[in-house]
Amino acid sequence: MALLQISEPGLTAAPHQRRLAAGIDLGTTNSLVATVRSGKAQTLADEQLADEQLIAGEQLIAGEQLIAGQQLINEKQRDLLPSVVHYHPQGIDVGWKARNLAALDPVNTISSVKRMMGRSLADIVQRYPNLPYQFHASENGLPMIQTARGLVNPVQVSAEILKTLAQRAQAALAGELDGVVITVPAYFDDAQRQGTKDAARLAGLHVLRLLNEPTAAAIAYGLDSGQEGVIAVYDLGGGTFDISILRLSRGVFEVLATGGDSALGGDDFDHLLADWLREQAGVATRDDHGIQRQLLDTAIAAKIALSEAETAVVSVAGWQGEVTREQLESLIAPLVKRTLMACRRALKDAGVTADEILEVVMVGGSTRVPLVREQVGQFFGRTPLTSIDPDKVVAIGAAIQADILVGNKPDSDMLLLDVIPLSLGLETMGGLVEKVIPRNTTIPAARAQEFTTFKDGQSAMMIHVLQGERELVKDCRSLARFTLRGLPPLPAGGAHIRVTFQVDADGLLSVTAMEKSTGVEASIQVKPSYGLSDDEIANMIKDSMANAQSDITARKLAEQQVDAARVLESLQGALAEDAALLSEQESAAIAQAVALLQQQMQGSDPQAIEAATKALDAQTQDFAARRMDASIRRALAGHSVDEV
């Protein structure tokens, strides 16, 4: 069965006609494009790269000064496109040329733009205070960067990278692409995913699907091998870390749990080493972005060299010294430990132990660091898989998926099931959260629930969409609010509103509310301006477990208070219309029961509120029966038996 069994209009392949598709790994540090040729997925090299730039990687170290922070390229790096864009009055450079201009013109050279995708300007400034760019805020608070070619936003910068990769693929395939699969971190939120789609649209690409990076790696590894069981995908890239626990069974590929940290990656290794080099060299870099870039370039080159050698000689800003693998490992050890803590949480979420993991797939260039491989191997108790280049494995998996979705493999038996990381729900009366789609539900998914009005004659309803695991609104994350208007003025509980939550294959959420009798409808697509980090998601899950008992107690109390308020409001309306049906003694008894209920509602004992509500209900049963009789008499007045 092909993934989702959905064919895009106009993309059904004719017999013997192969459609051109590509998989794109849009990375924080480097990006790649891959395709399937002769049945094999392979990354595509930049054949236009100048031969004089191709020198052995070892020459990056050994004390040679890199002129203006120039990054020299070895043969193996032809496939990589640095995710760097340089804006200058004459045009735009992308990739290695832009990368080599970063030290000379840091203000106009934008790198690691993926970290800015879908985030507000305030969030970016808080998370990354040392960025050299001149930021401006758009009307909705999103970041704009001042460049020599005017203001640009992260979506436009990403579009330049995608455009360059698409041109490489089209040159290699000698034709226009029919569609692409683009990979994103598993914890990209709605805004970040939508931003990626918008960038692809700007680049003129048809997106077949966004695919989680760890999932793409598992396609490249696990499904090719035909194994069944539980595997872990450890993805440590330049800017993000993801851990995914996946189950492979009879062609079904299911994500059991995901975790990680959207603000942790190899870039952080580089910055730690650059800071250490700055201290050793005694260089002041606060106001010199060129020296900052040079330090970072030297740190990157040293890190690469230390994956093969025990020591590396470095030279920066007139200072020359030596850095050892042991020194690097002491700097990055706390960060590696953070990744293992995320692995532990993911295993717990998946309900499996490390012993049950069949294979560990390593993804991302940062997994070449010996300490990372050693620590991951010790944690899972097995040697990680590294046979596919960790820089290329995600792009290869995306290419395999693109080949299927474009229609070249209609008989594929691959089925992919991703999950949402946190429950989605609505606010109900009393500040309670009604979960509509629970956490770890496979996507795409759609769920609907019916809600009703609280007050008589209610003509509108506020829909408050929430994300989280807690029972009360104040403890969950607000995603969006919208209002459904035009409800028929019925008694409380008379209107029936069907609310549908729909999460598509890319993880984007749409919420629709419809009143069933009139068909009035309102909807919203949730695009938060910035998202949660993986640590914040993990903390939300942890808090829900730590506060489970108190949350249940608080929910019971709120539910009883809402029920009591509903009874009191209904009784108030009935007394306003038909108080004459009661004797003075009955009125006094009801008033006493009302006072008792109101008193109990101020307390914190849900059982006492429930008992007082039942007592008031019992006290008003005769009154309710008389009202019904009176209503029937009024309805029959003036009519004969035959008319009835």
UniProtKB/Swiss-Prot annotation:
InterPro entries: ATPase_NBD (IPR043129), Heat_shock_70_CS (IPR018181), HscA_NBD (IPR042039), HSP70_C_sf (IPR029048), HSP70_peptide-bd_sf (IPR029047), Hsp_70_fam (IPR013126), ISC_FeS_clus_asmbl_HscA (IPR010236). Coiled coil: none annotated. Keywords: ATP-binding, Chaperone, Nucleotide-binding. GO terms for molecular function: ATP binding; ATP hydrolysis activity; ATP-dependent protein folding chaperone; unfolded protein binding. The keyword NADP does not apply. GO terms for biological process: iron-sulfur cluster assembly. Chaperone involved in the maturation of iron-sulfur cluster-containing proteins. Has a low intrinsic ATPase activity which is markedly stimulated by HscB. Involved in the maturation of IscU. HAMAP family: HscA. Belongs to the heat shock protein 70 family. This is Chaperone protein HscA. It comes from Yersinia pseudotuberculosis serotype I (strain IP32953).
